[in-house]
Amino acid sequence: LTVSYTLRLLMSTLLAALSTRAGCLVLVGRVGPVWQVDAPSIRRFLAAWRRSPIQMIRMGEFGFRALTLAVFYRHMRSAAEAIGYPWGRTDDWKTPPKADEQEAIPPYEYRFLNEELPSTPTEAPVDVHADVVIVGSGCGGAVVAAYLAERGLQVVVVEKGMYVSADKMPQTQSFGLDQMFERLGFVPTSNLSLAILAGSGFGGGSTINWGATLMPRHYLREAWSQRFGMPYFQSSLFSHDLHACARRMGTTDDVTHNRANSLLMLGAHRSGQPAQVVPQNNAHRPHYCGKCTFGCTAGHKQGTVMTWLQDAAQHGAQFLTHCEVDRVIMDRGRATGVEATVRGQQRVRVHGRRGVVVSAGSLNTPAILLRTPALRRNQQIGRHLHLHPVAFVHGFYDKPVRPWQGAALTTVSNAAELVDPQGWGAKIEVMASAPALYCALLPYHDHVEHKSLAFRYPYSYTAIVIVRDRDAGRVKLDRAGRAL
């Protein structure tokens, strides 16, 4: 895993202390180094760390536990299969309940500028020219790319991740998290209060999201309009744009619930609380695929790879993958291109005669701008970061739930959405479950309890409570120039 400098420093400090006799004595209560301490003593000191009044000790225990379990269950096929999880590609989507047998949508044959680069890196950067350079192929950049390409502009889309066609996606935790998520699926904040999940591949977050299409609520649109002085968000034009996107994705509320989502709907109805179907961007197909968070092998989920990037390609747009943007090229206050590196070796300059669009996500967009010398003086860059803080709630049933089967997110409870008059509430949804995340987040007191809970995975039900983020954070750069 690639973790932040703060977490590396904390873990390195603790490991260094544990490797000495004195440090081990202070932290563990036994003369070390730690690898000479018996296993029962190690389990006792980790349990004591969890209850420590010292924040650094508690953070260290969480880091050891969560990182170890996440890596173990991500890569150990035997462990994942032992607790009931089917490894690799599944064909559940072909035979959804109460529907005809389904067929995959053939993948579009993209062509990439990478094929035209020198086979061996050159000392001088390679120059690529276009009307508009778009950094990022996710939900923002792809829509802009299609819009501009359809109007006759020459567009180049730069993406730092890789492209994997639907028919070649292995749908394993290891490949999905390593290749399709930002920093291998673990981006901790500097104070370790949150761990961020973000997409990092061709199609961005739309390739690994859960296929849900929720329209912004009325109170949210009102807040955007009035707080930021942007009446567009309350206009009929914005509504038209939202519905245009929904139509292009084939959004429908005619969905098939898996058992976990059915339980959420049932529980809400029995308690008299509001719950509703979450429309899916599945091209009007019964998309019964529980592993779409590691890429959709059926091609039914209509992310940008299946929609706007295809539209852009059909109108002449070009694409450059494995290409990480270092900074924006500025000329007398105007953005004229980007400097980037392909596969960490070949330097390229992509020039945009008409302009540059940086749409690399909430973390990497400000990081690119902060790495641009001419823009560093702008103190607003990186500020006003709002996330979706999530709390996980585990429960278990007597009958199998099989949380990895079926569409991941098809129901939502809005019972707590308006606990505050201004809409600072929460939504309750169902998680796209996989052993690496499930086991890393399990609360337990010892190894026996952990093993017992891990074996109950097929019977588990994990609800997520998503909070609307009121207080803003900030994106900075770490020592390596990455988003922190």
Where are these regions (language model features)?
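Conserved redox-cofactor binding core of oxidoreductases
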Residues: 82-116, 120, 231-326, 335
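N-terminal Rossmann-like FAD-binding beta1-loop-alpha1 element of flavoenzymes
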Residues: 130-157
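Rossmann-like flavin
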Residues: 39-41, 48-51, 55-60, 72, ...
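Extreme N-terminal leader/targeting segments of oxidoreductases
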Residues: 51-131, 150, 190
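Flexible, low-complexity segments enriched for small/polar residues
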Residues: 1-83, 87
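FAD cofactor-binding and catalytic pocket of flavoenzymes
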Residues: 378-484
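N-terminal FAD cofactor-binding segment of flavoenzymes
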Residues: 153, 160-219, 257-269
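Glycine-rich loop(s) and the adjacent beta-strand/alpha-helix scaffold that form part
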Residues: 147-172, 195, 201, 314, ...
